Swiss-Prot record:
Residues 263-270, 323-419 are cytoplasmic. The gene is Gabrp. It is a multi-pass membrane protein. The chain crosses the membrane at residues 242-262, 271-290, 302-322, 420-440. SUPFAM superfamilies: Neurotransmitter-gated ion-channel transmembrane pore (SSF90112), Nicotinic receptor ligand binding domain-like (SSF63712). This is Gamma-aminobutyric acid receptor subunit pi. InterPro entries: GABAA/Glycine_rcpt (IPR006028), GABAAp_rcpt (IPR008100), GABAAR_pi_TM (IPR047032), Neur_chan_lig-bd (IPR006202), Neur_chan_lig-bd_sf (IPR036734), Neur_channel (IPR006201), Neuro-gated_channel_TM_sf (IPR036719), Neuro_actylchol_rec (IPR038050).
Length: 440
């Protein structure tokens, strides 16, 4: 019995020892595998100089970029800029960071301070910042072949030169340009990783006043005094949504013009009604013109398309008020002429009778006795008209004929013609306006 227990205890001891040995061998193999694929950062960067670029003194570092446009929060016409939040990803190969295996590992963002990274900056940026909540929004990832992926989340405000001459039917072209600050083309070469496909997110953006029509990427060279620098350009076109402005400005201004035409159907004798309509429409049009410029600075020197249309509408509204002034004045003149008519006729008859009755005696009274004769000199000044008086008489006669030619004989015709001409000319002005600004 005791012999059997001894044999069982011996077998159990041998089995336990063998299992421990096999377990230690497995742990050693796993640790060795991890050490080969995921080396310690200190061992990997031993002798690493972050102040020297990869291939220092040799071929330039080729950096491939991709962009994700998270949002375009604002587009300011007054400041000529736009604000966007982007995810910038850069890839390059650093032979000093090669390790065995086919795996990759992500480092803590704070370790980027110990590695060389490109000095990429955004050209024409007014202000930019890196997001820091809850930690710095940066990512650094190492691959076994030495490839480094460096990603950043940035919000930037970039200049965008705008041509507002066709506002609000304009299309603006904005750019986002990336370039190395200190390394020229002999040290760093930038490129888009997948061409136009390197940029994502623009097609999904929904902007308040704009629609993104198209975008494309370019690679150019920036020539500066310090050298030639590779520049990556993202160019995109923004077309303004005109429907908002049609409802806010164009429709109200058109209604005011039509409202001013109501006075053509009101009698000329209704002075308060027609004057009230004319003055009210003029003041309303002025208020609308001032309100349309509140979104743009007063120093803006552009004559915009919306200003042209509001100017046209204001001209028609003010013209309707002047039309009533002309018609009313002509009506008063006609009434005055009618009142003076009988008296003037009797006056002309009396004068004619006096002249006819006195002309014979007038002829008899003219004698050569009134002519002063002194030797051979004869003074005819009392019998002839001076040249200056004759010129004045002819000039007054011409002016009188011109005034009579332009005098409105029937003031009611002014309203009758205005009912046709004002709408016709306004429609023609709209046809030319929309055709020019929409298609030219």
């Amino acid at each position: 019995m005791s012999y059997s227990l001894y044999l069982a205890f011996l077998c159990l001891s041998l089995l336990t020892q063998r299992t421990c040995i096999q377990g230690n061998q497995v742990n050693v193999e796993v640790s060795r595998s991890d050490k080969l694929s995921l080396p310690g950062f200190e061992n990997l960067t031993a002798g690493y100089n972050k102040f020297l670029r990869p291939n220092f003194g040799g071929d330039p570092v080729r950096i491939a970029l991709t962009l994700d446009i998270a949002s375009i929060s604002s587009i300011s016409e007054s400041n000529m800029d736009y604000t966007a939040t982007i995810y910038l990803r850069q890839r390059w190969t650093d032979p000093r960071l090669v390790f065995e295996g086919n795996k990759s590992f992500t480092l803590d963002a704070r370790l980027v301070e110990f590695l060389w990274v490109p000095d990429t900056y955004i050209v024409e940026s007014k202000k930019s910042f890196l997001h820091e909540v809850t930690v710095g929004n940066r990512l650094i990832r190492l691959f076994s072949n030495g490839t480094v992926l460096y990603a950043l989340r940035i919000t930037t405000t970039v200049t965008c030169n705008m041509d507002l001459s066709k506002y609000p039917m304009d299309t603006q072209t904005c750019k986002l340009q990336l370039e190395s600050w200190g390394y020229d083309g002999n040290d760093v070469e930038f490129s888009w990783l997948r061409g136009n496909d390197s940029v994502r997110g623009l097609e999904n953006l929904r902007l308040a006043q704009y629609t993104i029509q198209q975008y494309f990427t370019l690679v150019t060279v920036s020539q500066q005094e310090t050298g030639n620098y590779t520049r990556l350009v993202l160019q995109f076109e923004l077309r303004r949504n005109v429907l908002y402005f049609i409802l806010e400005t164009y429709v109200p201004s058109t209604f005011l013009v039509v409202l001013s035409w109501v006075s053509f159907w009101i009698s000329l004798d209704s002075v308060p009604a027609r004057t009230c309509i004319g003055v009210t429409t003029v003041l309303s049009m002025t208020t609308l013109m001032i309100g349309s410029r509140t979104s743009l600075p007063n120093t803006n020197c552009f004559i915009k398309a919306i200003d042209v249309y509001l100017g046209i509408c204001f001209s028609f509204v003010f013209g309707a008020l002047l039309e009533y002034a002309v018609a009313h004045y002509s009506s008063l003149q006609q009434m005055a002429v009618k009142d003076r008519g009988p008296a003037k006729d009797s006056e002309e008859v009396n004068i004619t009778n006096i002249i006819n009755s006195s002309i014979s005696s007038f002829k008899r009274k003219i004698s050569f006795a009134s002519i002063e004769i002194s030797g051979d000199n004869v003074n005819y000044s009392d019998l002839t008209m001076k040249a200056s008086d004759k010129f004045k008489f002819v000039f007054r006669e011409k002016i009188s004929r011109i005034i009579d030619y332009f005098t409105i004989q029937n003031p009611s015709n002014v309203d009758r013609y205005s009912k046709l001409l004002f709408p016709l000319i306004f429609m023609l002005a709209n046809v030319f306006y929309w055709a020019y600004y929409m298609y030219f």
